[in-house]
Amino acid sequence: MKKIIDFMEENVDGRTLFTKELVYELENGALQGVYSDQISFSNLKYSQSGFQIDMFIVSNEKIWLIDKEGQRDKLRKDFSSVSMFRFELAMRKSTNAITGCFRFISASGKNVPAEAVVSGIYDVRLENSVLKLSESQVLYRDQPIQDGRYKPVAFQAEHRFYCEDGKLHYEYDGRCFDVDAKTMQRRHSSDTFPPFISIEK
């Protein structure tokens, strides 16, 4: 774990990164999302058994209804906000593995989709100077669909931290699942998202 904490202290804590605008489709093209952000990592704290670090995100995210001609019609939802999340990780003596959680702390704005959402973090490893970890969201969160409605979804993702030319890179590659809110069963969603790649300037 010391190598991972050293990596976080040297390469991640105190860094600010930017995600260029990217576009994704929802509901088989009925909606279109446009996203960009600024991410800052700070407040790294650690003990003999674990560590935590905060992630501040200033995001600009809008979801549009798409008309029959494939053009943006009406703004369905504006998720733009300033949010704070926290990674909390610890070493497990039973397996010598690092596990923990990634959770929402606070945000500006109303009806924040990540509010009260927690993800489990596992498979944390440092390979060839790349810090990798896997995320699996607990339960479900809301995702806007047509006609002013929402559907329950959950995400699984891979996170990667690495440096190129002295600049920190952070990659988030997520997969969306539709969730049966009664049974909590998941099935692959038709909604797909490109990898989010944030780079320090």
Ranges and model annotations:
Residues E61-G70, R76, S106-A116, Y140-R149, ...:
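Flexible, membrane-facing loop/turn or short amphipathic-helix motifs
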Residues D13-T16, R92, N96, D180, ...:
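Low-complexity intrinsically disordered segments
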Residues M8-E10, V23-E25, S42-Y46, F56, ...:
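Short, exposed beta-strand/loop patches in secreted or surface proteins that constitute
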Residues S40-N43, E115-S129, Q137, G148-H159, ...:
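Edge beta-strand at a domain terminus
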Residues N11, F18, S49, S81-S83, ...:
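Residues that act as N-cap/strand-start positions at coil-to-secondary-structure junctions
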Residues M1-D37, K45-K62, D67, R76, ...:
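Tryptophan-anchored aromatic micro-motifs
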Residues I53, S59, S80-F87, R92, ...:
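Soluble ligand-binding/transfer domains with enclosed cavities or grooves
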